[in-house]
């Protein structure tokens, strides 16, 4: 059931019920608060502050009604210098859904982008279809309404969470988020290179009016690879 709890943001961890009772992990990651979200959550350690929510991992369960309480709990913990672990039974669906809702609130990112970033370090993260639909319904408008409530209660959000989350995205995903100028330059260079390749690679008369799939693959590989390598080398 995974290889231990996963750090999503400074002060925010995602895991399963084994992680939540592992004193070595809890101590190493300095966990001070735990959200237990499964069928029968029970507090285990006296030195940790718990939020217990009884929720089954079934698509029809209205998990989004717990978003506000969980978001406030996590945010208060982080602002006070604590570390919060959000866990369910397997650390796959329920806990991931709660973490996504929090990250959406403090960053303004969409749930799919947040999930992609989480999967980069925790591939098993996978909300069930019903929870995904509820995250979609939560959306930008509701998450930003909740953000305003956080700021009214706690003040301006001091974290650089969006930057931290984007750093988790796969390199090629970040390549696609380049500036419009870079994209335009790449398009121009791509067209020129494709023309060169087409002149170098002979084609039969039958193919003279059809694009070559091989050339498309070569173009995609050679124009993404240098950018990814340069980003990776710059770390």
UniProtKB/Swiss-Prot annotation:
It is found in: Cell membrane. InterPro entries: Dual-sp_phosphatase_cat-dom (IPR000340), Prot-tyrosine_phosphatase-like (IPR029021), Tyr_Pase_AS (IPR016130), Tyr_Pase_dom (IPR000387), TYR_PHOSPHATASE_DUAL_dom (IPR020422). It is a lipid-anchor. It is an enzyme of class 3 (hydrolase). The active site is at residue 88. Residues 183-193 have a biased composition (Low complexity). Isoform 1 is expressed in testis; predominantly in developing spermatocytes (at protein level). Isoform 2 is highly expressed in testis. Expressed in spinal cord and specifically in oligodendroglial cells. Expressed in embryonic brain cortex; down-regulated in mice with experimental autoimmune encephalomyelitis (EAE). One of its GO terms (biological process) is negative regulation of transcription by RNA polymerase II. Keywords: Cell membrane, Hydrolase, Lipoprotein, Membrane, Myristate, Protein phosphatase. One of its GO terms (cellular component) is cytosol. One of its GO terms (molecular function) is protein tyrosine phosphatase activity. Residues 183-212 are annotated as: Disordered. A lipid is attached at residue 2 (N-myristoyl glycine). The keyword NAD does not apply. It catalyses: O-phospho-L-tyrosyl-[protein] + H2O = L-tyrosyl-[protein] + phosphate; O-phospho-L-seryl-[protein] + H2O = L-seryl-[protein] + phosphate; O-phospho-L-threonyl-[protein] + H2O = L-threonyl-[protein] + phosphate. Gene3D superfamilies: Protein tyrosine phosphatase superfamily. Pfam families: DSPc. It comes from the Eukaryota. Its EC number is 3.1.3.16, 3.1.3.48. Induction: Down-regulated by nerve injury. Residues 4-144 form the Tyrosine-protein phosphatase domain. Belongs to the protein-tyrosine phosphatase family. Non-receptor class dual specificity subfamily. May dephosphorylate MAPK13, ATF2, ERBB3, PDGFRB and SNX6. This is Dual specificity protein phosphatase 15.
């Amino acid at each position: 059931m995974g290889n231990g709890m996963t750090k999503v943001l400074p002060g925010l961890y995602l895991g399963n019920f084994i992680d939540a009772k592992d004193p070595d992990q809890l101590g190493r990651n300095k966990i001070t608060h735990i959200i237990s979200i499964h069928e029968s959550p029970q507090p285990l350690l006296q030195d940790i502050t718990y939020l217990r929510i009884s929720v089954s991992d079934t698509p029809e369960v209205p998990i989004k009604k717990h978003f506000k309480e969980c978001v406030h709990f996590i945010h208060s913990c982080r602002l006070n210098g604590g570390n919060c672990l959000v866990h369910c039974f397997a650390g796959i669906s329920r806990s991931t859904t709660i973490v996504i809702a929090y990250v959406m609130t403090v960053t303004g990112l969409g749930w799919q982008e947040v999930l992609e970033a989480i999967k980069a370090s925790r591939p098993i993260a996978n909300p069930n279809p019903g929870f995904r639909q509820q995250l979609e319904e939560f959306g930008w408008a509701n998450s930003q309404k909740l953000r305003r409530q956080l700021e009214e209660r706690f003040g301006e959000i001091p974290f650089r969470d969006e930057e931290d989350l984007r750093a988790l995205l796969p390199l090629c995903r970040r390549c696609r988020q380049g500036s419009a100028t870079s994209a335009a330059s790449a398009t121009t260079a791509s067209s020129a290179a494709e023309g060169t390749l087409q002149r170098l690679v002979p084609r039969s008369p039958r193919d003279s009016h059809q694009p070559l799939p091989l050339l498309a693959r070569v173009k995609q590989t050679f124009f993404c690879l240098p950018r990814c390598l340069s980003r990776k080398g710059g770390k």
